[in-house]
Each structure stands twice: as C-alpha cells, then as structure tokens.
C-alpha cells in the first residue's frame, strides 16, 4: 500500500547516533540523495550502520510553527439549509462520483448514520447531516453535489474525535456505519478506495470511550415459540459481551420469565427475528431495551448450526452440548450472524483468528443461581437506588472495593446471580476468610491489583484487530504482573476455587508474549498508528535502514539551514516544518527584501515571510517518500505483533477472569475486615439466624447516629413473622436488610452481623411499596395484587419472602381478609420463610392458631405528645400504628393533626360510625 502526504505527517527524526567511524558531511549528503534504495539495500545498509536502541519520536526535528496543530476545514459555512434533505430525492447519476458512492453505501444501511471519511474528517450528507447537526449541535454546511443539483447538506466531525461523537450517537439510541479509507493514494483519476469497515451499535461497540468500565455490555438475541395447545410459551436467549468474549445461552418457558430475565440482564441491545404480522415490540420485551430486528433466516435451525460450525471452525456441535436447547442454539446463530454483519473487514486477520473472538457458548440452567425477579432487584436496590437510579446508595456501592474494572464487573455478576451450590459458596468464603485474617497479604494483593489494566477487554480488542499500540503495552504490563500475583497466592492459599487455577498455573506462553511486546514497542507509543514512532530500533533491519536514511536527511536539513543563513546573511533564519505547507525558510518582514534570488515565496504571514528553494522542494519530496515507507513498515510490523497478541486472546482472558475473581474476593475481604462483618455459616437447611444484624448500605449512609442492630430467626420453628409497629419506625429497612444478608451470604461474602447461620434460598421475593402502573392501566392495588400472585405461584419452602403491607388499596375488611389469607397460605401450604410487615394488627391473632407464626414489633417510646423511634425489633405484637404522630413528625399542619386526633377518638369510642363535623367548623368557599 502506497502512502501519501497525509500519512506522512509527523517525523521519525531523532537525535543523530554517534558513529564509530564518522563520515564527512559531503559523504552523508551524497548518500542521502539516494531515496530509491531497494528493501534489500536498506537492510544491508542498516547492518553497516547499526542503530543504538532508543525511543523514536514522531515529532519532526525541524520545529513546528504555531499553526501546525490547527485542523483545516473541509467545507465552507452555509447558513441556508440546503434543498436536498434526503438522499432518495437525488438522482444518483447526477451526483459527483464521491457522493454517488456515499448514496450507494447509504442504501445498504438506511437505518444507520453513515460517517464517510474525507481526509481529516468523517462527513455525513443529506438526512444524516441534518440529524447529526441537531443531535451533536454541529454546524450544518453544504457541499457541491453535481451539475443541476447544487449544494447538498453536509456535517462532519474530526477523525481524531470520532469516537467521542459516535459514543454520543450511541447514547441517543442510534447505530453508526463507519466508511473509512482503505488506501492512502488513489490511482490517477480515480477515487480513493473506501468501504464500511465497522458498524457501531449499542451492543457491538469495543472502544473504551463507548463502554462502561465496571459493567458488562451485553448483546442479546432471542427466539420465541408462542404457546400452542398444550405446548407452553418457550424461548431461547443468547447473550454475549463482545468486549470480554463471554457468551451465555439459556432456554426456558413462560413469557413473564423472559421479561424478568431481560430486565435482569439489562442488555444494551436485543436482536430478534421480525415475522410478518408481529408487533414491533412484543409484550415480553422491556420498554427500555434497544431492539433490533433481522430476517428470520439466520435464526433457523440449519442456518444457525452452519454459522456456529463456521465461526468456531468445528466439524460437529456435539461438544458444545446444545442438543437440549435448540431455541438457544438458534438465538446464538442469529447473534453470531449479526456480529459478522457489523464487524470490520478482516484485512490483516489471519485465517485462524475470528474477527470477533467469542468463547464457546456456555449453557446456563434455571437452577444455577438464586432467582431474583425484577421487583426484588429493584426493592433491594442491588445495583442502583429505587428512587433516582443512582449507584451511590445501592448494595453494590456499599460492598464494591474492587481495584480493577474487570473485578468490578465480576462482583456485579456475582451480586446479580448469587450461588445455590453450598460447596462453591464455601470455596469463595475460604479465600475471603484467609484474606480477612491475613492483613499483610490482603494489602499486598491490593497493591499489585491497583495498577492492573482491563486485560479482559484489552485482549478482546487485540483479538478483533482494534487494539492500539498503547493497549498492547498495557497488555504486556498486565501479563508481567500475573506471575507476582500467582506467587503471592501460592505461598498463602492451601486451597482455592478452581477458577483461580488459570492464574496459579499461568500459561507459559504469556510471559513470552509480554517480552515480545516490550522488545518491539516503545514504552509510551503515540496514539496514531500511521505516523510512525511506535517501534524500537533493532526490531527490523528494513525499518532500521529507512531510519538511517531519514537521519541522513535530517543531517542535510540541518546543514541546509546553516548554508542558507550564510547565503542570506541572516543569522536568525529558521528552517521549519508545517503539516500542510511542508518545509520552509522563515524570515522576519524586515529581512524579507534581502533574501537570495533563488528563494521562492511560499506564504505571507503578519510578522514573517516563508520561502522555499528548489533544493528544499526536491528534498521535501524525497523525505516524504522515505517517511511514508518507514511509517508503512512500522504499521506492518505493528499489525503482525497485534495478530500475535490476538492469537493469545483466549489465554489472556482466562488469566484475566481469575484476576477479576481474585479482585472481587479481595474487595469483599476488605469490606468484611473494616466493616465489623462475620463469616456466615452456610448450610442446606431452611434456617436463617442472624444476631445483631445491620443493613449494609444504611449503616454506611448514617453520619450523625449509629445503626440499631436487630436479630432474625426463621425456618427452625418459625416460618412466618408478623411484624407490626409505627409508620417510619424502620420496618421496611428491617425487611431489606434480611434480604441483603441472605443474598450476600450466597455470594460468598461475609455479612454485617455478629453471628449468622444462613440456609440457602432458591428465590428471594419482595413486595415493598407499590405505585400505579398507568401505562398498563393498573391501579396501585392491582399492581400489589399482581406482585402478590407472582409470589404465591412461584415461592417454595426454600424461598425467602419479604412483604411490606398487602391489601391497603381497598376497603379495610377486604384488605384485612386478603392479608390474612395470604399469610395463612404462606405459613401452611408453602411454608416459605416469610416476614410480613403490616398495620393490620388483627394479624397478630394468627400466632394463636398456627404454631409456626410469631409476632414481632418495632418499639417506640412515648413521652407526652412526642414519639421516639427506637428501631428495635422485639417479640410481641403492637396494637397501635402511631400514624397521627408520624404525620406530625412529617410536618403535617398542627390543626390537621389535632383534628385527626379528635376523629380517631370518636371512631374508637363509637366503633365504625362516621364522626360528625364540629358545629363551630365553617366551610370557606372560594368567591
């Protein structure tokens, strides 16, 4: 590939190397005049003049002028909106060749913003330009479209800032097609070769600036089979994080469970086959999901099998174990097809590397993890707060002490899918226990982890051919830390979870890979891959030969500056370089009239004149050609190195996953050691015994007072606790802390308590508060009843059920009757471990009829008219809710509070009769 002047900006010039046998200046200049040396001549020449290893620089040795960093505009401003607002309005035959090519590409991607590379900018035209200018607040300008057409809308962004602008478009729910230049010099009279190199969608982005570092970016695909006769609604789901290589599939039944699973996954994008007559957004699809539809063919069984076989280069799918999940297999095939259609051209990718390296799909079964429906996740505020969706105030915020992005993602996955296997839980506990007890080891590991890069995503970018030089250096740095981490663990842990083996028995090829990166790349390479300055000297003889030639040219330039100073009699003359205008001789305005006759004026500025000479102009072309060859050779060497790293992406990721898990465990140990936590005793019983337990989030948010700890006992003799007490006394907080401690224990963490015994739960259900669902046409009461029905249909004797009021949104006796019946069913038929907070004090009577029901209350202290909340849970049922006192504390006007007391007294005296309006009370009507 030939490079043009655009590729040549920057320089490989460095300080001249001292030579053992110094040559005369004339000999150096004579050699530099030869710019047509063959590759073999350059290699031979590099052996005669070996280079001392140093970090090459991409900055020209000739000083840059003050304007050299400015971006050149590629179009004139036009304040009038151009007439052609859509590409379909234009006859392509009338367009210029470039715009005709743009329209051809746009026709293939009508639903995407098309960014078309023109020089230093990515440009949009027609409707895309109008949309781009509005969304990103860019100037809408125009470009000549051809004879009889005039100017068409145009807007663009600098190529070096394209990632930032694309990220903003993705956040607006758009996808972007990138058309890049595939060559740097076109044939005479022809356009530069350009094509779509990648398509950016919410689920397929790889660039660091478009991803959230501490959470997965899931792309999901779904295949559904509606219920027919006795056949239930079935679905298969595949979800992949293309940045980390994770690929999971599952197959289950029920549209409600699909909705719940998608809500829990929080995928960035969902792909599905669009069938004729079907709704564009089915009822089971959460409203906030970015939905992409495809043709049905990629989701067919034969096509999906073919796609999987080709992607993983297999002869059979038997080893993947997909026979029992045919719908999930079809979803996986559709997902891989979508990735193939949206990823870059595999120009420099060896046949053995997939353009988008994903691990073999891992089947996730329904019983693999603790089930948390969307309502429970929201009520327990696992990853964001219920009120405003903020991270601070969530459980993850309270326990996340990870030091790496991959560790944070790992901990998030653990919290979203706690374990059911007691053996796996104890394996995590064992590491946490040792790290809590061994403070020096914990702190040492944290020191090693703190500077660790995101190896998981870095390996993915390298495998996909997207990584830059700095990212390869970061990979080398991370790999070099792995043996030291492993050594720390070998000396400390007698037993460890099996997944840590990928760190403890490190792939021996990885240290060699890191050494290869260090040998070739400088420590702080430039961001650009096309301007040189990436590789060390002595990496490649051809590159060394080119650099020697460039050093000779540098010597000539330095000598030319001295020579022209003498000829002009101007000691202040400077030979400089401009990215646009090339090399020139700069003199002040006062000296401009005294320059030699052979100088040619190149540019006039306010304070100086710029000139060239015939020799300088000739030499400039030679320098550009040499620099282009050197830059191209460096890029070729870099691509070879990146390919070498990409082939090891799987090994790097395995080690990275082990580091991520270790980071999560070290963080949990830090929380436990500094937060007065205890190690829970985990077993397969139904018991939940907590001594002086606390809410892990609320205790960190309290500043002026201490958290009041309480006990919990469920599952041994008591299955259901009826919890009564005043409004705002802490009943909801008590319910949530029970659920969070159960969850933390099954993650493998210590818990905020003095002592804990936790029997493994299969599901956690919560019903805490309700609001109208106006979009679905449901009142608060109907929402509450739907949530209650879900619990009663799916809870088992191993479930933990946390209820905060049932039956409030209807008549008192109706609500009480429902609450009583639900409590009876939970205690007798399901025997779920349940805590039911209520203001129906009549429910205290259940304990007299059922031996597995107990009454508890949240204590308050009355001092005159004042009410002090003690936040202490004690045995026995309350007989008052103190609602009026709570209203007064909330700031309800005093006259309303006093009237409420009168009404309450009257109701208590007269039973259920309606209180009369006091005779002294008058009604003020508006005039």
Curated annotation (Swiss-Prot):
Residues 67-79 have a biased composition (Acidic residues). InterPro entries: DNA_mismatch_repair_MutS (IPR005748), DNA_mismatch_repair_MutS-lik_N (IPR007695), DNA_mismatch_repair_MutS/MSH (IPR017261), DNA_mismatch_repair_MutS_C (IPR000432), DNA_mismatch_repair_MutS_clamp (IPR007861), DNA_mismatch_repair_MutS_core (IPR007696), DNA_mismatch_repair_MutS_N (IPR016151), DNA_mismatch_repair_MutS_sf (IPR036187). Gene3D superfamilies: 1.10.1420.10, DNA repair protein MutS, domain I (3.40.1170.10), MutS, connector domain (3.30.420.110), P-loop containing nucleotide triphosphate hydrolases (3.40.50.300). One of its GO terms (cellular component) is cytosol. PANTHER family: DNA MISMATCH REPAIR PROTEIN MSH1, MITOCHONDRIAL, DNA MISMATCH REPAIR PROTEIN MUTS FAMILY MEMBER. NCBIfam families: mutS1 (TIGR01070), PRK05399.1 (NF003810). This is DNA mismatch repair protein MutS. The gene is mutS.
